[in-house]
Swiss-Prot record:
Residues 524-539 have a biased composition (Basic and acidic residues). GTPase-activating protein (GAP) for ADP ribosylation factor 6 (ARF6). Doesn't show GAP activity for RAB35. One of its GO terms (cellular component) is endosome membrane. A zinc finger (C4-type) spans 414-437. Pfam families: Ank_2 (PF12796), ArfGap (PF01412), BAR_3 (PF16746), PH (PF00169). SMART domains: ANK, ArfGap, PH. Residues 371-391, 518-596 are annotated as: Disordered. Disulfide bonds: none annotated. The lineage of its organism: Eukaryota, Metazoa, Chordata, Craniata, Vertebrata. It is a peripheral membrane protein. This is Arf-GAP with coiled-coil, ANK repeat and PH domain-containing protein 2. Residues 266-361 form the PH domain.
Length: 778
């Protein structure tokens, strides 16, 4: 290492040493200025580079937008996408380069300035301080008089100590100078070398990237050459066609008079006609008319849905109109209305009249052929009739979820667009959907619509019955109540954007629901409706006592209650085959009166409407309440804070419970007595509901205010089926906990038993009547 300042000169503290120090200190000060400037320039370069990358990213987004716009042109879309991806890689390479620049230049040089140059400055301060002390000691020693021995001795000692300290610090200072002079070379070169390697990597990555892209660019260049040639050829052809058409326009108008009854697209004739409006001013508007599918329709813009003037051409006639002032008019007359039209010329008028007359004749001929075929099909032989009955019987026996659900009124077509044969369903709404509408429903989120396939998914019996209870007609009466009044047209199949807007407005914004004012009824009336039942309940609800008291209470109520679900003979809904209200456990028979006579459901708030409809097993009213914003977990403070789900349990309907659970009901929400839906279902002996709640994650360890959980209640009531279900669920829960995080979702035996109970509760509820039959023996 070459020394900048000599150690020997340092010990002498000669003028040469002082001059060398002064030169070094000036050099270090200038070095610090240069390094600070370089670091600032590096920071500015990095910031500018980041701004460049940001602008480049925005430019890439513009290229991607252009690629999406060119989705119909595969060559342009593919090329732009590929180029934007490659340029995005270059942006990433730039980002890496700027990061490496920050580490190599900014970080390293800043560290050198802050660490090494700071040590040099600290050493300089110490050296200057000890130099001053040495000068003072020399001056003091020179001033001491010879006859003052004590002072001479003291000054000599101070001078000796100061000189020793000066030499030590001066040597350290010189060492720091020499080390700094040597280190600055390595630090500067190391940072610049790292910076250059970063550039090397950047350009190497760019070279590799464009080497891969090169063949594609060459192919694209060849395609572009062909495109230029093809464009020139097409231009010549179009110029020739333009010249030919121009000559035809001047020579004849016959091309506009053609019509074709057997056209492949079904359009017999089309063109512009003036139509007289039916308003008081009788204004004439020019519209694009066409004869297609035995109908006369018109539209103003291509995107507009055609307006049907005549639905069935067989029912109309066409005639000339010479009694009005305007020329070239003719009238299409149907049994309900007439439409006055005007052509641009007499030839066009004759062509339109002939086209309408020919279409009428064709419609009669086609309809006649169809009727003949239907007559042949509707009169089979006796043998074929029998075989038809047999096949129908087989079909009913092997009935699939799709067939059962599509038999519900309105379910044979999509609920939102009307497309036939829908294969998907929204299970919380109870409607059928086509595949395109189902995709839109999925995008809404499961809190609005839960989509399931009617052909690919497994359907639980209670869910299948729920779908059969509702249906498109029921739901559309709620969610499309004001569609006609608002003049809204349902989207047609294939109109994706229109469908999305319509479905969002229908189910998310609920724009078409018939809004009714909750505040239209005085609060006193609403309170009266609720408080009558609640007052009777407060006077009659017994506490669940131990032992026989519980058994006697339950047995007296269950004599008229089924533990499963079966079809009611009068309205077809699912209900318990009981002769008294399911609330008979809590009220003496005959005390309860139906409070629904006091106020129509439209005058209740949505939460109360849902609450009452849940007990009454009225699914359409429940759907209506939810559409009006009812909270599915609304608690009735007048009736022990019972929820709609608890009311559904008391009402004895498995399907009602399933509907509430599908719409987000909390299976563990409890009333003021600490009883949740599982408690109430256990008390009432509703085995099907207990099975349903356990499958939905009900907490069977929860205790009521008397400290009883559902299992203890079932044991005291000696309900073997419910005890079996609760113990099996508890055992399965313990098995899953012991197996840890990656354990199986459930034991096969457990799943099979619960599946059997679900099937019995929905399809054969009489098999779950054992508890009722046994209780009658006591």
């Amino acid at each position: 290492m070459k020394m900048t300042v000599d150690f020997e000169e340092c010990l002498k503290d000669s003028p040469r040493f002082r001059a060398a120090l002064e030169e070094v200190e000036g050099d270090v000060a200038e070095l610090e200025l240069k390094l600070d400037k370089l670091v600032k320039l590096c920071i500015a370069m990095i910031d500018t580079g980041k701004a460049f990358c940001l602008a480049n990213k925005q430019f890439m987004n513009g290229i991607r937008d252009l690629a999406q716009y060119s989705s119909n042109d595969a060559v342009v879309e593919t090329s732009l996408t590929k180029f934007s991806d490659s340029l995005q890689e270059m942006i990433n390479f730039h980002t890496i380069l700027f990061d490496q620049t920050q580490r190599s230049i900014k970080a390293q040089l800043q560290n050198f300035v802050k660490e090494d140059l700071r040590k040099f400055k600290d050493a300089k301060k110490q050296f200057e301080k000890v130099s001053e002390e040495k000068e003072n000691a020399l001056a003091k020693n020179a001033q001491v008089q010879r006859n003052k021995q004590h002072e001479v001795e003291e000054a000599t000692n101070i001078l000796t100590a100061t000189r020793k300290c000066f030499r030590h610090i001066a040597l350290d200072y010189v060492l720091q100078i020499n080390v700094l002079q040597s280190k600055r070379r390595s630090e500067i070169l190391k940072s610049m070398l790292s910076f250059m390697y970063a550039h090397l990597a950047f350009f190497h990555q760019g070279y590799d990237l464009f080497s891969e892209l090169g063949p594609y660019m060459k192919d694209l260049g060849a395609q572009l050459d062909r495109l230029v040639v093809d464009a020139a050829k097409e231009k010549r052809e179009m110029e020739q066609k333009h010249s030919t058409i121009q000559q035809k326009d001047f020579s004849s108008d016959d091309s506009k008079l053609e019509y074709n009854v057997d056209a492949a697209n079904g359009i017999v004739m089309e063109g512009y006609l003036f139509k007289r409006a039916s308003n008081a001013f009788k204004t004439w508007n020019r519209r694009w008319f066409s004869i297609q599918n035995n109908q006369l329709v018109y539209q103003k813009k291509f995107k507009d849905n055609p307006t049907v003037v005549v639905e069935d051409l067989r029912l109309c006639t066409v005639k000339h109109c010479e009694d009005i002032e305007r020329r070239f008019c003719f009238e299409v007359v149907s049994p309900t209305k007439s439409c006055m039209l005007q052509a641009d010329s007499e030839k066009l008028r004759q062509a339109w009249i002939k086209a309408v007359q020919t279409s009428i004749a064709t419609a009669y001929r086609e309809k006649g052929d169809e009727s003949e075929k239907l007559d042949k099909k509707s009169s089979p032989s006796t043998g074929s009739l029998d075989s038809g009955n047999e096949s129908k019987e087989k079909l009913l026996k092997g009935e699939s979820a799709l067939q059962r659900v599509q038999c519900v009124p309105g379910n044979a077509s999509c609920c939102d667009c009307g497309l036939a044969d829908p294969r998907w369903a929204s299970i919380n709404l109870g409607i059928t959907l086509c595949i395109e509408c189902s995709g839109i429903h999925r995008s809404l989120g499961v809190h609005f619509s839960k989509v399931r396939s009617l052909t690919l998914d497994t359907w639980e019996p209670e869910l299948l019955k729920l779908m059969c209870e509702l249906g498109n007609d029921v739901i559309n009466r709620v969610y499309e109540a004001n569609v006609e009044k608002m003049g809204i047209k349902k989207p047609q199949p294939g109109q994706r954007q229109e469908k999305e807007a319509y479905i969002k407005a229908k189910y998310v914004e609920r724009k078409f629901v018939d809004k009714y004012s909750v505040s239209s009824s005085p609060p006193e009336q609403e309170k009266k409706v609720v408080s009558k039942d609640s007052e009777e309940k407060r006077l009659s609800i017994p506490k669940l006592g131990p032992g026989d008291q519980v058994r006697t209470s339950i047995q007296s109520s269950v004599k008229s209650n089924d533990s499963g679900i079966q079809q009611s003979s009068d309205d077809g809904r699912e209900s318990l085959p009981s002769t008294v209200s399911a609330n008979s456990l809590y009220e003496p028979e005959g005390e309860r009166q139906d409070s629904s006579v006091f106020l129509d459901s439209k005058h209740l708030n949505p939460g109360l409407q849902l609450y009452r409809a849940s007990y009454e097993k009225n699914l359409p009213k429940m759907a209506e309440a939810l559409a009006h914003g009812a909270d599915v977990n609304w608690a009735n403070s007048e009736e022990n804070k019972a929820t709609p789900l608890i009311q559904a349990v008391l009402g004895g309907s498995l399907v009602t419970c399933e509907f509430l659970l599908q719409n987000g009901a909390n299976v563990n929400q409890r009333d003021v007595q600490g009883r949740g839906p599982l408690h109430h279902a256990t008390v009432l002996g509703h085995t099907g509901q207990v099975c349903l709640f356990l499958k939905r994650g009900a907490n069977q360890h929860a205790t009521d205010e008397e400290g009883k959980d559902p299992l203890s209640i079932a044991v005291e009531a000696a309900n073997a089926d419910i005890v079996t279900l609760l113990r099996l669920a508890r055992m399965n829960e313990e098995m899953r906990e012991s197996e840890g995080l990656y354990g199986q979702p459930g034991d096969e035996t457990y799943q099979d038993i619960f599946r059997d109970f679900s099937q019995m509760a929905s399809n054969n509820p009489e098999k779950l009547n054992r508890f009722q039959q046994d209780s009658q023996k006591f």
